[in-house]
UniProtKB/Swiss-Prot annotation:
Localisation per UniProt entry: Mitochondrion
The UniProt record lists the keyword Lyase: no
Transit peptide per record: 1-19
CDD domains assigned: Complex1_LYR_LYRM2
CC per GO annotation: mitochondrion
Family under the similarity heading: Belongs to the complex I LYR family.
Signal peptide annotation: none
Location, primary (coarse class): mitochondrion
UniProt-listed InterPro entries: Complex1_LYR_dom, Complex1_LYR_LYRM2
Lineage: Eukaryota, Metazoa, Chordata, Craniata, Vertebrata
Protein name: LYR motif-containing protein 2
Gene: lyrm2
GO biological process, one term: mitochondrial respiratory chain complex I assembly
């Protein structure tokens, strides 16, 4: 009998793609947060984002993860819009 070469903990293709989306979103969020001019606000947002991602790190429900990705994208877009408006008003 041939056994699989993949370890039992290997991700499925869907899980792998979803993981890449989450990592990309996290990196984009951190890049956007770096643009926040006030150091205190920047630290607060960075800590908030890290805590949110860390809190949901062990989620396995695909639908819940998709919903969290959608919410995080909305927060990211809102932050980018706020930064754009703040730069226009200067």
């Amino acid at each position: 009998m041939a056994s699989s070469r993949l370890p039992a903990s290997a991700l499925t293709l869907k899980q792998f793609i979803q993981r890449q989306k989450v990592l990309s979103l996290y990196r984009n969020m951190m890049r956007t947060i770096r643009q926040v001019p006030d150091e205190g606000d920047r630290k607060y947002l960075r800590d908030w984002a890290r805590d949110e991602f860390k809190r949901n790190k062990n989620s396995t429900n695909q639908d819940a993860i998709r919903m969290m990705i959608t919410q995080a994208n909305m927060h990211h877009d809102e932050l980018q819009s706020s930064l754009a408006l703040a730069n226009v008003k200067k």
